[in-house]
């Protein structure tokens, strides 16, 4: 729910490096 929104916002910069972004994907 809302938690995913906040987590996604904090992971935004990491997704560029293919780090936690892969986990969310």
Curated annotation (Swiss-Prot):
GO terms for biological process: starch biosynthetic process. It is found in: Plastid, Chloroplast; Plastid, Amyloplast. InterPro entries: Starch_synth_cat_dom. Pathway: Glycan biosynthesis; starch biosynthesis. ADP-alpha-D-glucose binds at residue 16. Its EC number is 2.4.1.242. Expressed in endosperm. Keywords: Amyloplast, Chloroplast, Glycosyltransferase, Plastid, Starch biosynthesis, Transferase. One of its GO terms (molecular function) is alpha-1,4-glucan glucosyltransferase (NDP-glucose donor) activity. It catalyses: an NDP-alpha-D-glucose + [(1->4)-alpha-D-glucosyl](n) = [(1->4)-alpha-D-glucosyl](n+1) + a ribonucleoside 5'-diphosphate + H(+). GO terms for cellular component: amyloplast; chloroplast. Belongs to the glycosyltransferase 1 family. Bacterial/plant glycogen synthase subfamily. This is Granule-bound starch synthase 1, chloroplastic/amyloplastic. It comes from Fagopyrum esculentum.
